Design a protein with these regions (language model features):
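A general beta-strand register signal
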Residues: 2, 107, 121-123, 157, ...
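Glycine/serine-rich phosphate-binding loop and adjoining beta1-alpha1 elements at the start
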Residues: 2-34, 50
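Short loop/edge segments at beta-strand edges and connector loops
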Residues: 3, 17, 37-39, 108-110, ...
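Core beta-strand elements of the Rossmann-like FAD/NAD(P) dinucleotide-binding domain
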Residues: 3-12, 126-135, 172
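Short glycine-rich hinge loops at helix-strand junctions in the catalytic core
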Residues: 18, 71, 101-103, 155, ...
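Short glycine-/small-residue-rich Rossmann-like dinucleotide-binding loops
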Residues: 18-19, 124, 137, 141-142
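FAD-site-proximal beta/loop scaffold in flavoenzymes
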Residues: 30-47, 130-207
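Rossmann-like dinucleotide-binding cores of NAD(P)H-dependent redox enzymes
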Residues: 42-43, 48-52, 58-128, 185-193, ...
Length: 208
């Protein structure tokens, strides 16, 4: 492993470089003054009066719930026909019903086409629609941080943009492991913590 011209060696290597927010370029270009990522939203000095959340996955729903509780008027735009696509549909429907009761507006099956300043343009139910808000939160997903690793150069295999691993977090190169968002399995902090323990247990001979 080479870092800033310095070589580091080890019997085993664990890659844990995480992920970054996926930001569609055409959206960021016109809405950069109002368009925020979940990381940037955590640094807000005050609660916005209104928020449009693009994406109804874990991060989008989490922030929609939080901001609604803090007093924001929240609209969630989701391309699929239900929120939280990684959970059972019954759980998804219950969460949507409860959050709708709390005042959150969901637009399911909405296809966002453009973000310009404080306005989000989208297609919904065969019509062109738009919604204005003080803040637009981009939460359509994350991408593994693999740039600069030269992983392909040493023969590490990928599953799309994520590093492929087995149940023990091993890559196809036995002494190299990948944990957390970079392996693309489940992009949640507690999952990364567990995967770290799995990898260390395997390195210590306790993998079974």
């Amino acid at each position: 492993l080479s870092v800033d011209g310095r070589s580091i060696t080890g019997a085993n290597i664990i890659i844990a470089t995480g992920s970054s927010v996926f930001m569609p370029p055409f959206l960021a270009l016109e809405g950069e003054n109002h368009l925020l990522t979940s990381t940037e939203a955590l640094d807000l000095d005050q609660v916005p009066a209104s928020v449009t959340v693009i994406g109804g996955g874990v991060i989008g729903v989490e922030f929609a719930y939080l901001l609604n509780r803090l007093g924001s008027k929240v609209t969630v735009l989701e391309l699929m026909d239900h929120i939280l696509p990684m959970v059972d549909i019954e759980v998804s429907r219950l969460a949507e019903k409860r959050m709708t009761k709390d005042g959150i507006l969901f637009r399911l099956g909405a296809k966002v086409s453009r973000v310009k300043d404080d306005t989000v343009y989208y297609e919904f139910g065969g019509q062109n629609c738009q919604v204005k808000s003080d803040m637009v939160l981009m939460a359509v997903g994350r991408v593994p941080n693999t740039q600069g690793l030269n992983a392909e150069g040493i023969g590490i295999e990928f599953d799309r943009k994520a590093i492929r691993t087995d149940a023990h977090m091993r890559t196809n190169i036995p002494h190299i492991y990948a944990i957390g968002d970079v392996n693309g399995k489940v992009m949640l902090a507690h999952t990364a913590s567990h995967e770290g323990m799995v990898a260390v247990a395997d390195i210590c001979g306790q993998g079974e």
